[in-house]
Amino acid sequence: MVVRPNVKELPGPKAKEVIERNFKYLAMTTQDPENLPIVIERGEGIRVYDVDGNVFYDFASGVGVINVGHSHPRVVEAIKKQAEKFTHYSLTDFFYENAIILAEKLIELAPGDIERKVVYGNSGAEANEAAMKLVKYGTGRKQFLAFYHAFHGRTQAVLSLTASKWVQQDGFFPTMPGVTHIPYPNPYRNTWGIDGYEEPDELTNRVLDFIEEYVFRHVPPHEIGAIFFEPIQGEGGYVVPPKGFFKALKKFADEYGILLADDEVQMGIGRTGKFWAIEHFGVEPDLIQFGKAIGGGLPLAGVIHRADITFDKPGRHATTFGGNPVAIAAGIEVVEIVKELLPHVQEVGDYLHKYLEEFKEKYEVIGDARGLGLAQAVEIVKSKETKEKYPELRDRIVKESAKRGLVLLGCGDNSIRFIPPLIVTKEEIDVAMEIFEEALKAALK
């Protein structure tokens, strides 16, 4: 039997009190008490229960972290067993086998068969920082390319890669020098006005031409160490590039000895129906940055990288808590669960996408529906003809959905992402889509 969402009052009295204290004592700048006043008390599977007894479907997965579901019994058991043994003994100076076991599993799952190593961290931002250091240290090249609308983190160095929203940069200039941004091949809306769904090769070629004709005018190719990219842009709007784009980019980069640094922090660990999102595109990246879902809710991240560009001398890189033994134990179990779930993710992902495509045909304000697996999104516009962005309506839809028990998150300027835990069933998707359509209608009034 499907347990449906049940919301009596949002926010309820207990939630209101917690939210008031939250803003008094915590320096938070990303929470949205107007549209998402949800104060979690516990989670189970795809459901979240708040402090006032309201029940929600979590189609945000804790911002892409809870891929195997809230409090998955196997993950909880792995955490308990490890916590009873020891909770910390830093990899900076000491050794424990589970850190090696997880690294072996991740390397085995990486595309291709080149020799690789893993360096651990705690967050996606840390993983991207480590990747930048690996590229600089391993190649001697000090400059990077990244994409407009990309998100790679908010710490000072990786903020130079991030180009998602100007508010993320406001007050922090100068960021690290040596990063040049290029257009991402967004099939729906791009600099050149190309319909990338109808002309994917043309869109791909325009991006490569931009690098060669404009970037290389002022950045020497031999000084560029890597191109940082997301196989599907996350915070930029869940944008899926043309199928052949990354193969073309890899061929182009190889001509100049430039590495590809694949940020899988949000799209990896089974989210798209493949363990790594880049597998959909048939490319073997030189570095794979991972995070979010790998720890099953605990802080864990890292970089899988070519062994020939690794840190090979003492003291070049370390982090006290990177590869924490409790998080590693959770990660080992997460990998096994996700491997079992991959066929299911492809099936229910297609099922969810069909709903979104139907909504696109039915409603003038849904300009695009896109995604792979359970990384899906719709883009909200004022009209299909003009494609004018409609962020105000997007926010109202998110608010109305939450009031009815469906937790959604925006992405990009005007899109909504649908990223439930990978264990979601078709019946639960039916309920969620019923709620979403009700919320959409209410927001349009």
Swiss-Prot record:
Matches recorded under SUPFAM superfamilies: PLP-dependent transferases
Pathway: Amino-acid biosynthesis; L-proline biosynthesis; L-glutamate 5-semialdehyde from L-ornithine: step 1/1
N6-(pyridoxal phosphate)lysine: modified positions: K292
Disrupted-gene phenotype: Disruption mutant cannot grow at all in the absence of L-proline.
A Pfam short name: Aminotran_3
pH dependence of activity: Optimum pH is 6.5.
Cofactor: pyridoxal 5'-phosphate
UniProt cross-references to InterPro entries, sorted A to Z: Aminotrans_3, Aminotrans_3_PPA_site, Class-III_PLP-dep_AT, PyrdxlP-dep_Trfase, PyrdxlP-dep_Trfase_major, PyrdxlP-dep_Trfase_small
Role according to the record: L-ornithine aminotransferase involved in L-proline biosynthesis. Also shows high activity toward L-lysine. 2-oxoglutarate is the best amino acceptor, but 2-oxoadipate also leads to moderate activity.
Record protein name field: Ornithine aminotransferase
